[in-house]
């Protein structure tokens, strides 16, 4: 599915197509692209822009695409310029003309911005989950080392003795503040 270049008479050089393609890196947004498209299809149906039947058909089609990608039945290939083109072509192939109505009232740039926001939100949550797991380990180390001593450091020099619990407690407190950053 070609998105641009309709008025040109010659075939676009493969180097240009490769330069413009983003499928190699934006395919990681497939879940977010589907999530945003399902929400958009719901809105189109609720607003009466498309019929409820078409909205449901689009949502079901997108849900089946997600299931097939995650099960390995459907592979995202580089024959498409980007993840949005892949999704649209696959949806139209599965549900017919109703799939063409998904982009009503939404530009690809809107889609890219939404996909990136959703992806970033999901990745921040994943990182936060990892930090929480790390904090549990640190807390265990603290509890196990209340009476274990080590040299404290100041200006990269050995200083007064501190407990391992106190040392690790400083890191625990730093990680506790992670919510203010996010």
Predicted regions and their residues:
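A helix-coil-helix interface module used to build multimeric assemblies
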Residues: 1-179
């Amino acid at each position: 599915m070609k998105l641009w270049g309709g008025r040109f008479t010659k075939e676009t050089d493969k180097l240009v197509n490769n330069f413009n393609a983003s499928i190699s890196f934006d395919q990681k947004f497939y879940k977010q692209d589907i999530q945003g498209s399902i929400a958009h299809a719901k809105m189109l149906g609720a607003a009466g822009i498309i019929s409820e039947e078409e909205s449901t058909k689009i949502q079901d089609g997108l849900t089946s695409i997600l299931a097939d990608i995650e099960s390995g039945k459907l592979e995202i290939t580089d024959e498409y310029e980007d993840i949005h083109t892949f999704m649209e072509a696959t949806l139209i192939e599965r549900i017919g003309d109703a799939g063409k109505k998904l982009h009503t009232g939404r530009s690809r740039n809107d889609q890219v911005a939404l996909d990136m926001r959703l992806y970033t939100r999901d990745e921040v949550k994943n990182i936060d989950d990892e930090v929480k797991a790390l904090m549990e380990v640190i807390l265990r180390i603290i509890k196990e080392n209340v009476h274990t001593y080590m040299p404290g450091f100041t200006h990269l020099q050995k200083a007064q003795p501190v407990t391992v619990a106190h040392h690790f407690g400083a890191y625990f407190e730093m990680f506790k503040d992670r919510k203010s950053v996010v």
